[in-house]
Amino acid sequence: MKAELIAVGTEILTGQIVNTNAQFLSEKMAELGIDVYFQTAVGDNEERLLSVITTASQRSDLVILCGGLGPTKDDLTKQTLAKYLRRDLVYDEQACQKLDDFFAKRKPSSRTPNNERQAQVIEGSIPLPNKTGLAVGGFITVDGISYVVLPGPPSELKPMVNEELVPLLSKQYSTLYSKVLRFFGIGESQLVTVLSDFIENQTDPTIAPYAKTGEVTLRLSTKTENQALADKKLGQLEAQLLSRKTLEGQPLADVFYGYGEDNSLARETFELLVKYDKSITAAESLTAGLFQSTLASFPGASQVFNGGFVTYSMEEKAKMLGLPLEELKSHGVVSAYTAEGMAEQARLLTGADIGVSLTGVAGPDMLEEQPAGTVFIGLATQNKVESIKVLISGRSRLDVCYIATLHAFNMVRKTLLKLENLL
C-alpha cells in the first residue's frame, strides 16, 4: 500500500511552525507496514489544495491530510476534500455533543456560528473522535482510495492517530507486526557494528536501527498471520540480538532497557519506583529542574515524588542544601564531592528513599577547567552514596542537559533493578 501525507497550512510554508506531524505519521505507517511514498505541504488555498488532492489520488492508495479542521475561514481541509469527492458535509452527533458540553461551561457569546464547522464530517465517512480538542477527524474510502483528515495540533493529532486511526488501519490493511527495543549507553554506529551480520542478512523479520537523542532503538518487524506467531518470531530474534556483546565486551542486554516507541528511561524508572514503593528527590544544578519536571509529568507522580531543589549557584548549594561553602570552593561545583553531597543532603532534607543530583558544565564555555559537557551525577540511598562522571561532548546546552537527565534516570533505574534482584 502506498500512502501520501499532505500537511495543510500556510504557516508551515512560511516557516512559522515545523511539520513534526510528518515524522510521527511516517513512523506510525511504517509500524503498520504501509509505505509512505510522498509528503506534501500546501497553504490554506482551496485551488492549490484541490490540485494536491487530485495528484495524490492518482498515485497513492491512502491519502492523509493534517490540519485545517478548525473554525476559521482558512480551515478548509474537510470542505475541499468533500468538494473533490462530491460529498456533502454532515454533522457528527458525538462531536456536536462535545461542542455543547464545552461551551456549556463558557459565556454564551463565546459560541460563534463558525465553531459548528468543527463537528462536521464528510458524508459516508467514519468519524475519528478528538479526545483533546473539538475538531472531529474522519476516514472515508471512495473508488478504492482511502482518505483521512486529522487535526493539525500534535496534542490533538497524536491521540487521534494512536487511539482511533491505527486500530482502524490495522483491521483493514496491516499484516506487519513490530517490536521496538530501546538501548541506552551505546551509540548507533557501535550497535550496527555489533549486529552487522544480522542487519546485512535480514529477510523476515527485519531489523531497523534508529538514532534518537542520547539513545538508540531497534525496530524488529515481521509479516505473519497473527500476533502469536509474530511474538514467537520476534522473541527468538530478540534473544539472539541481546546475547551479543558490545565492542568493550559488555553484554548487549546490559544496555537494553525496555520496549515501545513511546517508552522512555524516565517512564521505566517511574514505574519501578511505584512498583517498589520508593520515594525520590533531586537536587539539580546545570539541568535546572529538568529531571524533576520530567518525573512530575507522569500521572501519579506524587506517589513517589514530593519535591526537590534547584541550586544553580554555589551559594544556593550551600544555603539550600547545607553544604559547607568552603568545601564547595575547594572541590568546585563540577566534582564528585559536590554531586554526592547534593544527593545526600537532598535525601536527608526531604526524607526520600533516593536522592539524585546533577552538576556540571552545560557549555559552551569551560568551567573550573572542565570542558563543556562534563557532568557529575550523584545518587544517595540509606546505605550508599556514589557518583558517576559523564562527558557529553559536541552537543548544545539543551542536549547536554537532556542527555545528563537520561543518565540520571538510568542510574536510578539500575539501582532499583539491583533491589529487584535482592527480593
UniProtKB/Swiss-Prot annotation:
Gene3D superfamilies: 3.30.70.2860, CinA-like, MoaB/Mog-like domain. Pfam families: CinA (PF02464), CinA_KH (PF18146), MoCF_biosynth (PF00994). InterPro entries: CinA, CinA-like_C, CinA_C, CinA_KH, Competence-induced_CinA, MoaB/Mog-like_dom_sf, MoaB/Mog_dom. Belongs to the CinA family. This is Putative competence-damage inducible protein. It comes from Streptococcus pyogenes serotype M3 (strain ATCC BAA-595 / MGAS315).
